């Protein structure tokens, strides 16, 4: 008897989730890997539970299989081992979720998060890379840990004096507004990036940027240790997935960087010629929809 034949519903069980999904109104937008994404686990579980509440499931086994479809290694390998250890006929969905949470969740280390933030600056990174890094680190902050005003102050301290003054002049009410204002300000004036010079028409062009590109290529760390140290038994498996570094490089190859946009006189938003960011129709249409 195969492993799947032991599931209530017999050998036809693996087809069950596929038959249910066409009537499923929402699909989880998240996946959980179990490596350096502990801060995403609560949202992942909440979204899984929300989607499951919209249709009826015949048994706990079907709910477990649905959740496992959104796990990547090493979390996927852990789920396979956990189900076999507990027994497919005895394990409940609540037990599975509780085991997933206890095994992979690590409380964020606030001191490490703030130390990582203080290492950032617009002068060193430029506004685009500053925002990218800041978002990545800030996402690990516990929800409602500080007020919106305190969050804005934390971010604006990383800006150059010129950008800081312009952002504060517009009095942003949310962190998102402050980051957007800093981005728009730099994109419109094009005067806060080192290595730029003006051509005969007064437009900004790029000077030698080889060293900047080399620094950008080494911009991504393989480990983001911003959680409290805690012993976790991890099952060692062969990697059957793409390395994170490859994903970042592919993304840079597919999307024009900020420097390339300036060099080729492209819009920062739609990457097309003939207009600037504040004139982009696609960007305005997207803002109206949201």
Swiss-Prot record:
Zinc finger (CCHC-type) boundaries: 265-282
Site (Cleavage): 207-208, 233-234
Main subcellular localisation: cytoplasm
Pfam families associated with the record: Ty3_capsid
SUPFAM superfamilies cross-referenced by the UniProt entry: Retrovirus zinc finger-like domains
Parts of the chain that traverse the membrane: none
Record's keyword annotation contains Transmembrane: no
Keyword ATP-binding: no
Disulphide linkage map: none
Domain notes for this protein: The N-terminal domain of NC, but not its zinc finger, is required for nucleoprotein complex formation and its chaperone activities.
Protein name: Transposon Ty3-I Gag polyprotein
